[in-house]
């Protein structure tokens, strides 16, 4: 059986944790930040866990994660 290919776009966006969950960046922290509060920007810097309903699709894109 040939090796499975990793989706490179997904590999750049998601990171697997030790427990098998996936971490992702939060949206809305790229540009247009002037009107956003420091508290919100600080919160948007943190990583979020991918929802369990989306994790299966991420797992298929990252077979070796």
Curated annotation (Swiss-Prot):
It holds the Pfam family Ribosomal_L35p. Keywords: Ribonucleoprotein, Ribosomal protein. PROSITE patterns: RIBOSOMAL_L35. SUPFAM superfamilies: L35p-like. One of its GO terms (molecular function) is structural constituent of ribosome. One of its GO terms (biological process) is translation. NCBIfam families: rpmI_bact. Belongs to the bacterial ribosomal protein bL35 family. This is Large ribosomal subunit protein bL35. It comes from Prochlorococcus marinus (strain NATL2A).
């Amino acid at each position: 059986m040939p090796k499975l290919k990793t989706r490179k776009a997904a590999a750049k966006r998601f990171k697997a944790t030790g427990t098998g969950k996936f971490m992702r960046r939060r949206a809305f922290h790229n540009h247009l930040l002037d009107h956003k509060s420091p508290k919100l920007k600080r919160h948007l810097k943190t990583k979020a866990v991918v929802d369990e309903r989306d994790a299966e699709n991420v797992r298929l894109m990252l077979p070796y994660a």
